[in-house]
A protein has these predicted regions:
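Conserved N-terminal beta1-alpha1 strand-loop-helix module at the mouth
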Residues: 1-117
Length: 117
């Protein structure tokens, strides 16, 4: 079985060719203002046009609200990856598959952070 690969943090249109050539399964686009990899909608859409149709596009967010989820869905992402705190509104608004990234300092935190699922 081949592992699936996501290349994340794309910043410019030229990055799309790298993702295409590398054979990645997923391309990650960061939407978090505190990140140096943060993109505007316009930047992301320009890069997305150059991504091969076989590569799934992942919107990476931190503590998104329902409005941000709806905007990302309009942009034709395939998956939404959420970090941070999740609101019930954001989860309810998500009509796409959701990946929830959890940072743990010890295994006991897993149950506490995932009991709402």
């Amino acid at each position: 079985m081949r592992p699936e690969v996501k290349i994340c943090g794309l910043k410019k249109p030229a990055d799309a060719q790298y993702v295409n050539d590398a054979g990645a399964d997923y391309a990650g686009f960061v939407f978090y203002e505190k990140s140096r990899r943060n993109l505007s909608r316009q930047q992301a859409e320009e890069i997305m046009k150059k991504i091969s149709p076989r590569i799934k596009k992942v919107a990476v967010t931190v503590s998104p609200d329902a409005a941000q989820i709806k905007t990302l869905q309009q942009m034709k992402f395939d998956i939404i990856q959420m970090h941070g705190k999740l609101s019930e509104d954001a989860i309810t608004a998500a009509e796409l598959p959701v990946w929830y990234a959890i940072n743990l300092s010890d295994p006991e935190e897993f149950e506490a952070k995932t009991k709402s699922f």
